[in-house]
Amino acid sequence: MRGTPLLLVSLFSLLQDGDCRLANAEEKLMDDLLNKTRYNNLIRPATSSSQLISIRLELSLSQLISVNEREQIMTTSIWLKQEWTDYRLAWNSSCYEGVNILRIPAKRVWLPDIVLYNNADGTYEVSVYTNVIVRSNGSIQWLPPAIYKSACKIEVKHFPFDQQNCTLKFRSWTYDHTEIDMVLKSPTAIMDDFTPSGEWDIVALPGRRTVNPQDPSYVDVTYDFIIKRKPLFYTINLIIPCVLITSLAILVFYLPSDCGEKMTLCISVLLALTFFLLLISKIVPPTSLDIPLIGKYLLFTMVLVTFSIVTTVCVLNVHHRSPSTHTMASWVKECFLHKLPTFLFMKRPGLEVSLVRVPHPSQLHLATADTAATSALGPTSPSNLYGSSMYFVNPVPAAPKSAVSSHTAGLPRDARLRSSGRFREDLQEALEGVSFIAQHLESDDRDQSVIEDWKFVAMVVDRLFLWVFVFVCILGTMGLFLPPLFQIHAPSKDS
């Protein structure tokens, strides 16, 4: 039992001595490798001036932070892994307590100064200079994290069902292809630690090495970020409200022309669509190369609503026509009163208009002129009694037949009627007044019939424009939105 504490103390001392020797070995190795007399971090690690230093690149995407469509900038969080060999940093591990890996501050060793060429904020290099990992064979691995803002040309043609190809172009700032060679370690970027974006889907991340045959000193490595937008946000907040507002324009053709609100509804819908168009202009980049899909749809619907305003003016003009201002042509009657209503599933209710107006029997005695004559001169046939279409008020009861038949039997009908003592001048004036009233009522009924015909023509025109509006709206909406949904966008590449 007494030997146990001594054993523990001995083991602890051995471990501590081992750590001290290892720390001393790493410190000695660091001093030996980075001795200013044998290592200069400004000199390219080449044994001769013609030797190419091969830089192996591999990009790891951590997060697609944002894509600013209006400023055409893509912000990404990436790790750019760089590997190369520096023969001056090789050592024999057996001479340094078996140390095979050494971590050295990045600014104390030679770096290939690879930067993002197409940056958009002036920050070309990485923000954090992490340590480089150096192995005993001289291979160096550097994995600096960086948040890059790169320029990205936004294609707005299919917005919000668009697919973009944004690139990250890496190149050495001071070394050309005669001094270093940039190669891809893997054909695509790594997404092992990728955090999914709520707005974009990653379609592909291919990498490519670009050289210029006409310029032997040029070489770069480019990664294509092929991303596809998730359209749910814009569908809910833009497309569906626009479709619903456009559908309100259909109600314009259902409103009666007498209500006086057709033009108000049309202009209100047009103003709402104009507001959405201004909202779109704040999102997409101000480019004249193409029109975004949602902008095309808004312009299309604005044209339709403007068309509905024009048709509403035409319908109201037809609706308020009268015989005193317009004469209905025969082709208008044939086309809009007989033929078109059948094709538009319209049926005009039958109207039974009578020009005979009969007061209550208890107030007036009604008789025709023939009836008055018959009352004074003798009986007549029932056909003559009801043959006339004109009625008048007779305030005096008919006299008995025997009272007038003796001295008027030999006279003509009109002479007998006028020679009758009961045919007074006021009765003649009453007959003329009643005749005028009857003619006026008949003229009013005839004018009213023409006015009703114009109103029905306006209803037919309204229904015709309704079907035209519905068909054009449906076909236009499908023609605009269906092709981008099923179209496969080919990724564009730089020349």
UniProtKB/Swiss-Prot annotation:
Subcellular location, record wording: Synaptic cell membrane; Cell membrane
Membrane topology: Multi-pass membrane protein
Statement: the UniProt record of this protein carries the keyword Disulfide bond: yes
Tissue spec: In the brain, it is detected in the medial habenula. In the peripheral nervous system, it is found at least in the adrenal gland.
An individual GO BP term: locomotory behavior
Catalysis: reaction(s): Ca(2+)(in) = Ca(2+)(out); K(+)(in) = K(+)(out); Na(+)(in) = Na(+)(out)
Lineage: Eukaryota, Metazoa, Chordata, Craniata, Vertebrata
Keyword Ion transport tagged: yes
MF-aspect GO terms: acetylcholine binding; acetylcholine receptor activity; acetylcholine-gated monoatomic cation-selective channel activity; heterocyclic compound binding; protein-containing complex binding; transmitter-gated monoatomic ion channel activity involved in regulation of postsynaptic membrane potential
GO cellular component: acetylcholine-gated channel complex; cholinergic synapse; neuron projection; plasma membrane; postsynaptic specialization membrane; protein-containing complex; synapse
Gene field: Chrnb4
Coiled-coil regions listed in the entry: none
Family the UniProt entry places it in: Belongs to the ligand-gated ion channel (TC 1.A.9) family. Acetylcholine receptor (TC 1.A.9.1) subfamily. Beta-4/CHRNB4 sub-subfamily.
Annotated site location: Key residue for a low dissociation (K(off)) from the conotoxin BuIA: I133, Q141
Oligomer and partners: Neuronal AChR is composed of two different types of subunits: alpha and beta. CHRNB4/Beta-4 subunit can be combined to CHRNA2/alpha-2, CHRNA3/alpha-3 or CHRNA4/alpha-4, CHRNA5/alpha-5 and CHRNB3/beta-3 to give rise to functional receptors. Forms stoichiometries such as (CHRNA3)2:(CHRNB4)3 or (CHRNA3:CHRNB4)2:CHRNB3. Interacts with RIC3; which is required for proper folding and assembly. Interacts with LYPD6.
Glycosylation sites: N35, N92, N137, N165
Annotated organism of origin: Rattus norvegicus (Rat)
SUPFAM superfamilies: Neurotransmitter-gated ion-channel transmembrane pore (SSF90112), Nicotinic receptor ligand binding domain-like (SSF63712)
Superkingdom of source: Eukaryota
Positions in the Extracellular compartment: 21-235, 286-297, 485-495
Function: Component of neuronal acetylcholine receptors (nAChRs) that function as pentameric, ligand-gated cation channels with high calcium permeability among other activities. nAChRs are excitatory neurotrasnmitter receptors formed by a collection of nAChR subunits known to mediate synaptic transmission in the nervous system and the neuromuscular junction. Each nAchR subunit confers differential attributes to channel properties, including activation, deactivation and desensitization kinetics, pH sensitivity, cation permeability, and binding to allosteric modulators.
Protein name: Neuronal acetylcholine receptor subunit beta-4
Signal peptide: 1-20
InterPro entries: Neur_chan_lig-bd, Neur_chan_lig-bd_sf, Neur_channel, Neuro-gated_channel_TM_sf, Neuro_actylchol_rec, Neurotrans-gated_channel_TM, Neurotransmitter_ion_chnl_CS, Nicotinic_acetylcholine_rcpt
